[in-house]
Amino acid sequence: MANIKSQIKRNRTNENNRLRNKAVKSELKTLIRLVKRAARDNDLPRAEDALRRASLKLDRAVSKGVIHPNQAANRKSGIAKLVVATRLRNSTAGE
């Protein structure tokens, strides 16, 4: 247990940040999972909508300092590839 007043406050701040970061990361995982599920089911409109929401949330997490910008870029490109593949599957299936 800290005795110094500033360290007590710092511990409290760190705990609040940890909980916020955990919630944001959990929501990111959920949104990415939605994109993957929609892509797997060949549901293009749902996949594109989920991709848009996930990209916004990833950018917001970067601006808040929750994740590194490169990690967000890697995740965005990965789910974007899935949506593009879904778009190609749907366009060739219609022919």
From Swiss-Prot:
PANTHER family: 30S RIBOSOMAL PROTEIN S20, SMALL RIBOSOMAL SUBUNIT PROTEIN BS20C. One of its GO terms (biological process) is translation. Binds directly to 16S ribosomal RNA. This is Small ribosomal subunit protein bS20. Keywords: Ribonucleoprotein, Ribosomal protein, RNA-binding, rRNA-binding. Belongs to the bacterial ribosomal protein bS20 family. Residues 12-22 have a biased composition (Basic and acidic residues). InterPro entries: Ribosomal_bS20, Ribosomal_bS20_sf. Pfam families: Ribosomal_S20p. Gene3D superfamilies: Ribosomal protein S20. The keyword RNA-binding applies. One of its GO terms (cellular component) is cytosol. The keyword rRNA-binding applies. HAMAP family: Ribosomal_bS20. GO terms for molecular function: small ribosomal subunit rRNA binding; structural constituent of ribosome. It comes from Tropheryma whipplei (strain Twist) (Whipple's bacillus). Residues 1-22 are annotated as: Disordered. It comes from the Bacteria.
